[in-house]
Amino acid sequence: MSLDFRNINTLWSSVIVETLHRLGLTTAIICPGSRSTPLAIAFAEHPHITAIPILDERSAAFFALGIAKRTQTPTAMVCTSGTAGANFYPTVIEARESRVPLLIFTADRPPELRHCRAGQAIDQIKLYGNYPNWQTELAIPAPEMGLFRYLRQTIIHGWERSHFPTAGVVHFNCPFREPLAPIIQPEIKELVTNFENNRFFESVKPLQPNLTVPCLSLPPQWLTKKRGIIIAGVAHPKDPELYCQAIANLATFLNYPVLTEALSPVRNFAHLNPNLITTYDLLLRNKELAQNLTPDLVIQIGDFPTSKELRNWLETLEPDHWIIDPSAENSDPLHNKTTYLRLSIESFKLEQSKCIEEKNNKSSWLKTWQIIDQKIREEINLTLESVDFLLEGKVSWLLSQILPPKTPIFIANSMSVRNAEFFWQPNNHQIIPYCNRGANGIDGTLSTALGMAYQAQSSVMLTGDLALIHDTNGFLINPHFRGHLTIILINNNGGGIFEMLPISDFNPLFEAFFATPQNLDFSQLCQTYKIPYQKIRDWPQIEKLLKPLPKAGIRILEVQTDRKKDAVWLKKMLSELAKRVDFRSEELSEN
């Protein structure tokens, strides 16, 4: 037990931290400030919690998010009063939308110093609107055991709310009166006997995992539909292999193709799933193929994929749509005829029955998808193997084949995630992809990736120049970083994703206000933050630098590409590749 009896604020804060430790907290991110002094001391001095000081609140919050994404355990964040907590807001939004557990402790002035121009005091009650799972203001610390019992149980409840019913943010607003520093208040020593023998904390234990509620049988509608598809969307499962195996089991039972997003681990466990389809975005650009492959049933697992082609296709068709999702969220942006199964894919128990046995016969529907997917993949491989110049789209394709097994990779938003969707190859490397696809912003990209990589296996980040520039304060984490992160920087001097949109035809407005080139010398930026830097000259060099990955530190490998040339190449590739596939429409119609 680690309690600090120097004064009422240190005792109050140490009860918070000891309760969190017993619940399972291991990491706290501390931003500097005066009003939060008691909390900072309590976290920093606890022997079993790693407390990391980070200057910039926005970067600190995204770093905490990255840690929580990987561990799927709440990370605590602490800041002082005033605008400090407002800098956590983008992370709160992303955590809510991507279902990541976080605990926020914003220190505050007591009620008598609010709304009276006392300084560094804003209205922090419900600071984050409706985004937290739960939010509360704690009582003013006072030497009463009834209040300490209230504090313990409130922290336990907050921990639970960060997990259930869906993982997310819990916000504790924490008012403190003076003294903020650990100045001795002798009368507090009288409370020591109330905390002896560990009885105060004996009921504080880690949460028990959710009991699995099995689906006793598949919905009968599924067993009668021959032309079904399974969509494996964005997902960060706690056990990637178990998750991928569960999807494979369902797909094998139903003989359905599995259209798999690059931000799902399913593409990286290809040996588990013979029904894997990864080229659906390109396939659906061939309107004849898309028409002939119309499904009568869609089963969605995870969030909807990045692919706009897939969205448009299903929005037009309006098939019966089932979503497997344990949360209470509305996960259907298409507003289809949707039925929800509120459970996890791992919960399915597939019963043997005559109906299923009949379903297990070889499906011509599945075979058609597999043949087309294989042909398109062969075209992709032939095309990219012949590309000898530095091309943005080839980077994802190469990474999917050369990264060491089980490498965590953080893929930035905008073009990085889309190139992965187009070109990330199915493999058996068990690579674990991470992303910020809750709100899809580029803010906090570097900091989140550093959090993902903190005390983890050597990791990789794939990003464009603007996403990295937007979060360069993340490099201030470097002195406290433990682990390794290789940053593969695609520098095309601007927002390449806008080159794919109609606005790209409207110059000079486009270049100044949308592409927004920054003309930054990244080698000089790296010198400022003492980050090792290398400029990539050719493809063999990047492969050599990634096999194996270093064990510690941060480094940047810069791949300079031509934004205009990349966009022309990609537009041509996307429009022509599926059309080159030789597959007769009569065969599709028969299937």
From Swiss-Prot:
It comes from the Bacteria. Pathway: Quinol/quinone metabolism; 1,4-dihydroxy-2-naphthoate biosynthesis; 1,4-dihydroxy-2-naphthoate from chorismate: step 2/7; Cofactor biosynthesis; phylloquinone biosynthesis. Gene3D superfamilies: 3.40.50.970, TPP-binding domain. It comes from Rippkaea orientalis (strain PCC 8801 / RF-1) (Cyanothece sp. (strain PCC 8801)). Pfam families: TPP_enzyme_M_2, TPP_enzyme_N. The lineage of its organism: Bacteria, Bacillati, Cyanobacteriota, Cyanophyceae, Oscillatoriophycideae. Keywords: Magnesium, Manganese, Metal-binding, Thiamine pyrophosphate, Transferase. Its cofactor is Mg(2+); Mn(2+); thiamine diphosphate. It is an enzyme of class 2 (transferase). Homodimer. This is 2-succinyl-5-enolpyruvyl-6-hydroxy-3-cyclohexene-1-carboxylate synthase. GO terms for molecular function: 2-succinyl-5-enolpyruvyl-6-hydroxy-3-cyclohexene-1-carboxylic-acid synthase activity; magnesium ion binding; manganese ion binding; thiamine pyrophosphate binding. Its EC number is 2.2.1.9. Binds 1 thiamine pyrophosphate per subunit. One of its GO terms (biological process) is menaquinone biosynthetic process. Catalyzes the thiamine diphosphate-dependent decarboxylation of 2-oxoglutarate and the subsequent addition of the resulting succinic semialdehyde-thiamine pyrophosphate anion to isochorismate to yield 2-succinyl-5-enolpyruvyl-6-hydroxy-3-cyclohexene-1-carboxylate (SEPHCHC). It catalyses: isochorismate + 2-oxoglutarate + H(+) = 5-enolpyruvoyl-6-hydroxy-2-succinyl-cyclohex-3-ene-1-carboxylate + CO2. PANTHER family: 2-SUCCINYL-5-ENOLPYRUVYL-6-HYDROXY-3-CYCLOHEXENE-1-CARBOXYLATE SYNTHASE, PROTEIN PHYLLO, CHLOROPLASTIC. Belongs to the TPP enzyme family. MenD subfamily.
